[in-house]
Amino acid sequence: MPVLEIDKEYLYSLLGMRLSRDELVEILEDTKVNIEGFSDESIELEITSDRLDLLSTEGIARMIKGIIGKELGIPKYPVEHREEELVVDESVKNVRPFAVGAILLDVRLNDSVIKSIIQCQEKIHETLGRKRRRVAIGIHDLDAVKPPFRYIARPMDEVKFIPLGENREMTAREILENTEKGREYGNLIRNEEGLVPLIEDSMGRVMSMPPVINSELTRLSERTRNLFIDVTGTDEKSIRTSLSILVHSIAETG
């Protein structure tokens, strides 16, 4: 089962209050999480498979607020359905067939929020995602690109972009052969046609090559205010559940 590392100061900021060690332990021991570690700075919690909504610090904060009576009931967030924002092309059918997306506006990111979002993303990859085989998530700076977006498969030698963490443009083949993420996850999209799945913006710029790596183009920073999230995979129910978990977690940041 996944183990989540909780930054206590960030947790307190989400709660809007501080709790003593004894109070936190008492609350957590009455829930479906197991305390694996507890220090002055952080808490390590093992999350059970039936509470994947707790795969983030924000999810833990939401649960605690309900237990202590600070916020009761199911949280409600303003939602606008914009189906035109992500078009799924027929070419991905035999590569990695399903994709969903969401846009989140006016998000306030700082180091703690970014770390928490990325941790939630990776925990989803490990659990529901089956190490990205079933589900993979990309999180992008919306203001760096132009919607609508397209999920499409193209020949790997015709695809070029700067992968996240690199400083030069590479072909998709080079990324799969020469980068750490490419070697680790490239086997998940290998096919006889030599196609790779891509998320592109309306100008044809590559945002990600799921489930392998994002583009440097949409890297998150503390200046990022608007997000686009893509979730791709081989099981439609799992990608929708994963998107819901992550979007609700980010919404809790305010």
Where are the model-predicted features located?
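RNA/tRNA-interacting regions in translation and RNA-turnover enzymes
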Residues: 1-254
